[in-house]
Amino acid sequence: MFIETDYFGKIEINEAETITFVSEIPGFPDSKTFVLIPYGEDLPFWSLQSIEEQACAFVVTNPFWHKSDYAFELSDGAKDQLGIEEAEHVSVYSIVTLREPFESSTLNLKAPIVIETKERRGKQVILDDAYPARYPLGGTKAEVR
């Protein structure tokens, strides 16, 4: 399947790798199906690209690579919505807000993207924990190109 993207142009994706969101990402009601596109083999960043909207894409990263003590408990409701049965079938991403210079970019730790990897369901979860929506990326050496 081919999709048009603002960042990568027209690309081919494997439909089996798409992620269906069980609820909308706030502010993006028309985007329900996404795919993760790596920015490069050696970079810890992906584009969470909407299948429905070419211009809807988020730079995401694994928050545990940037804040090793990051931890939260998913509600039973979120687990049920996503069909989570085992922790090994869960991936977590944080949306990155890019700034110049790159070192001043931030991660949204308050609202992670949680993906159940077996059935490929996703949801942005708003945490009650005291995590910030703008956690400094700081010392990360990689750059998004």
Swiss-Prot record:
Listed GO biological process terms: bacterial-type flagellum assembly; regulation of translation
Annotated localization: Cytoplasm
Family matches, as InterPro entries: Flagellar_assembly_factor_FliW, Flagellar_assmbl_FliW_dom_sf
Primary localisation category: cytoplasm
Nucleus found in the keyword field: no
Cellular component, GO annotation: cytoplasm
Keywords of this entry: Bacterial flagellum biogenesis, Chaperone, Cytoplasm, Translation regulation
Pfam families assigned to the protein according to its UniProt record, in alphabetical order: FliW (PF02623)
Paired cysteines (S-S): none
Function: Acts as an anti-CsrA protein, binds CsrA and prevents it from repressing translation of its target genes, one of which is flagellin. Binds to flagellin and participates in the assembly of the flagellum.
HAMAP family named in the record: FliW (MF_01185)
Subunit structure: Interacts with translational regulator CsrA and flagellin(s).
Family: Belongs to the FliW family.
Protein name, per record: Flagellar assembly factor FliW
Species assigned in the record: Exiguobacterium sp. (strain ATCC BAA-1283 / AT1b)
Gene label: fliW
